[in-house]
Amino acid sequence: MAVPFVEDWDLVQTLGEGAYGEVQLAVNRITEEAVAVKIVDMKRAIDCPENIKKEICINKMLSHENVVKFYGHRREGHIQYLFLEYCSGGELFDRIEPDIGMPEQDAQRFFHQLMAGVVYLHGIGITHRDIKPENLLLDERDNLKISDFGLATVFRHNNRERLLNKMCGTLPYVAPELLKRKEFHAEPVDVWSCGIVLTAMLAGELPWDQPSDSCQEYSDWKEKKTYLNPWKKIDSAPLALLHKILVETPSARITIPDIKKDRWYNKPLNRGAKRPRATSGGMSESSSGFSKHIHSNLDFSPVNNGSSEETVKFSSSQPEPRTGLSLWDTGPSNVDKLVQGISFSQPTCPEHMLVNSQLLGTPGSSQNPWQRLVKRMTRFFTKLDADKSYQCLKETFEKLGYQWKKSCMNQVTVSTTDRRNNKLIFKINLVEMDEKILVDFRLSKGDGLEFKRHFLKIKGKLSDVVSSQKVWFPVT
């Protein structure tokens, strides 16, 4: 069942987990507005409380159509809540077919939107420092949104730019200068990461484990061995652009203004029917008004613009996926109650509400948590009941050598390692829908493409029991 959170708001499902907490989907039971709520346990984040304050402060600065909106924050005891846009289109990695990629026209469109978001961030002096498909979300109109500013920092203030020295990010996406333990400029680092994202979109795989001479794939790239994977799968025009982006020397790396002049970047590609677009401004009228209201009532700490950055922080995981929905159909007062609500109640195991068949009623029911289900391809119906489906999953996990445990209700947590020997954790929910069992996979920690590879492997092993019925989500 849905868990009451603030007046008229319920927590209906977990969107993701991180080192210090999780992200929950909150839905207004009257208006059906949806907001992502990042819940941080400050007791678990005791070693880096300033990082949380910094993340809040940076989020407050942001307002762009290709950046996840921030509605406000609230502290209750040792729990910090951040209220963010809910993106029902899911993560970009879900649109990338392992070892194949996506249609070139889709990759170009997403890359355009990624560039627009990064140009905006750099324009206000912010560098993201962890650009990767797991941190790029899609709204209900398939517009790309940059999310997760936990590693972001200010590199320019009052027209004065500072060099950075903190090594952070996700190794396959970081620029080579980060690994040299010297100071570096911020903007070329984000540009490099965007090039790796473009490679993943076009080829369905990452080019290397890390950009260092100890990595054979990276050495091959520097020696221009483009007859190897992933480069041989990429057409000559986008490959020419990647040759200009993935340049080891930062000063020789192409800048975003020059990327926008590139032949492939400006090449008209057949996109078919044009998708409807969100409003061209950064914030919708109602959410902008809401934003002004909460900003005048909430206390934000200033950004620390000091030049020293002492920690080494690399991520092989998927941080909390922030997701978003626009609130222009209703006034700000409903979300205002969510941000400034007095009574918060925390579920001990929030995902139990996903497996209660009584909630899965008629379409349009505000009590149906699947009304706001994130769109993703990693789910299927089975021909069996819940018990038999669970038994088949168990047998498959044992054959594949996975570690697994049953957690909340009909949920299983699976742990394994990917091809790079990094930890990969995903959760599987068995949900009764229309007298059928939906098996829903969600990445909890690790690389998105590797997660999809394992999903396809499991689905292949279960081919005899997988139903041919399509899963159409999200329901709107």
UniProtKB/Swiss-Prot annotation:
Region (Interaction with CLSPN): 1-265
Post-translational modification: Phosphorylated by ATR in a RAD17-dependent manner in response to ultraviolet irradiation and inhibition of DNA replication. Phosphorylated by ATM in response to ionizing irradiation. ATM and ATR can both phosphorylate Ser-317 and Ser-345 and this results in enhanced kinase activity. Phosphorylation at Ser-345 induces a change in the conformation of the protein, activates the kinase activity and is a prerequisite for interaction with FBXO6 and subsequent ubiquitination at Lys-436. Phosphorylation at Ser-345 also increases binding to 14-3-3 proteins and promotes nuclear retention.
Result when mutating residue 280 to A: Enhances cell cycle arrest
Region (Autoinhibitory region), start-end ranges: 391-476
Matching Pfam families: Pkinase
Enzyme Commission (EC) number: 2.7.11.1
Location of the active site: 130
Miscellaneous information on this protein: Haploinsufficient for the suppression of genomic instability and tumor progression.
Protein family membership: Belongs to the protein kinase superfamily. CAMK Ser/Thr protein kinase family. NIM1 subfamily.
Name of the protein this chain belongs to: Serine/threonine-protein kinase Chk1
Protein encoded by which gene: Chek1
